[in-house]
Amino acid sequence: MSESIDINVYSQTTIPNAMAELMDNHNKMEQISAYCKSLYANGDAAQAYEQTQGYAKNALLNVAYHIQTVGTHITSLLQLQTNEMEKLNIEIQTLTQRVRMIHDSTGTNVFSNQDAAKPYKSSLKNRKVDTEATKAPVKYVHKPISYGISASDINQNGVPPPLNHSNSSANLTSSSGHLAASSTSNSSTPSYQSPSYSSQPTISSGTPPPIQKQPPRVGNAPPPPSLSVPAAPPPPVMNVPPPPPTSQRPSSVNNNAPSNDFPPPPPPSSSSSGGDLPPPPSFGLPPPPTLGDDFPPPPPPPVGSYDFPPPPARPQSQFYDHNDFPPPPPPM
């Protein structure tokens, strides 16, 4: 605060007063030079020279003094202004540093460089879609699926084209009349039901089974699919031996006994002591041959059949081998 007051005093009072004294001394030097000229004209020249020389020294000293005083005051004023500028510079730097710290802490440092250089590309942008060649998108039209087949859709061989959902709904830009006709034909198409059938065919004497009528076809609707009834599988064949003929059955069989393939058991023996059992019944088969001593001895083995050593024994492993298990039973 004191320096600011000093600056004001120097700039408003001290320096103007020093300049005024300098100008006053300059005016007095003009008066002294006019007085010295009059001495040379009216008086002694040697005395006038000495007085003029003394006045000139004093005038120069006064001028130098006043110039020095004014210069000193101006230098002091400039020094005060320099000090004040340094203080202002320090305060500005302090405020700038504080603002940067606040921007860094709050994340708003992007606003510090408002005059940042922007990169401009020298080449023009390559437009991928030309605005002149663009067309308006096709408006979506809800079109129901048409299952009808017209005469124009049948080819030369008389085979209708297969139904395809994508083909029937792909043309979205069809006329309104075709849409109305297709919607009318589809709304009147009945829902077909498959005819009921049974796995076992019913056989009636003399009367054929009734023929189920198909529902009438409306418009260009395709015929309903035909259902094929699979044939019933044949019964399995059991491996049961055929019964013996009636001629080989024993005559002791009662006619009132149930008809089966096996003879009845023999009657129990009348003797309680357990005598000889009756012989088994014969079914007309020849008796078995009797074993006797009439068979010839077996032929001797060929010579040299035992020249080879026996095969080595298979090593016993700690783990199971697939050869250790018995062979599987024959199929039934």
Curated annotation (Swiss-Prot):
Residues 248-257 have a biased composition (Polar residues). One of its GO terms (biological process) is establishment of protein localization. GO terms for cellular component: actin-based cell projection; cell leading edge; cell-cell junction; filopodium tip; lamellipodium; pseudopodium; SCAR complex. Residues 152-332 are annotated as: Disordered. Residues 221-247, 277-314 have a biased composition (Pro residues). Residues 164-206 have a biased composition (Low complexity). GO terms for molecular function: signaling adaptor activity. Residues 73-104 form a coiled coil. Keywords: Cell cycle, Cell division, Coiled coil. Disruption phenotype: Cells show no developmental defects, mild motility defects and serious defects in cytokinesis. It comes from the Eukaryota. Part of a Scar/WAVE complex containing brk1, scrA, abiA, pirA and napA. Interacts with scrA. Involved in regulation of actin and microtubule organization. Required for proper cytokinesis. Belongs to the ABI family. This is Abl interactor homolog. It comes from Dictyostelium discoideum. The lineage of its organism: Eukaryota, Amoebozoa, Evosea, Eumycetozoa, Dictyostelia.
